[in-house]
From Swiss-Prot:
InterPro entries linked: Toxin_18
Location of the protein in the cell: Secreted
Signal peptide: 1-18
Main location: secreted
Description of its domains: The presence of a 'disulfide through disulfide knot' structurally defines this protein as a knottin.
Protein name: Conotoxin-like peptide
Sorted UniProt keywords: Disulfide bond, Knottin, Secreted, Signal
Disulfide-bond pairs as recorded: C25-C39, C32-C43, C38-C50
Length: 53
């Protein structure tokens, strides 16, 4: 029974990470609030748009 719990926990962890990786990101110039919303990983804190890489 314990191995089933470990396998279930691993499957849930993998599924949650896959959703984050597969989520669409915003292109350069798109409106953003956080860095992780942009494909480049950089959101302007003053103007709230995605910066180029």
């Amino acid at each position: 029974m314990q191995i089933k719990t470990v396998l279930l926990a691993f499957a849930m962890f993998a599924a949650l990470n896959a959703q984050h990786v597969l989520a669409a990101c915003a292109e350069t110039g798109a409106v953003c609030v956080h860095n992780d919303e942009c494909c480049s990983g950089a959101c302007s804190p003053i103007f709230n748009y995605c910066l180029p890489q």
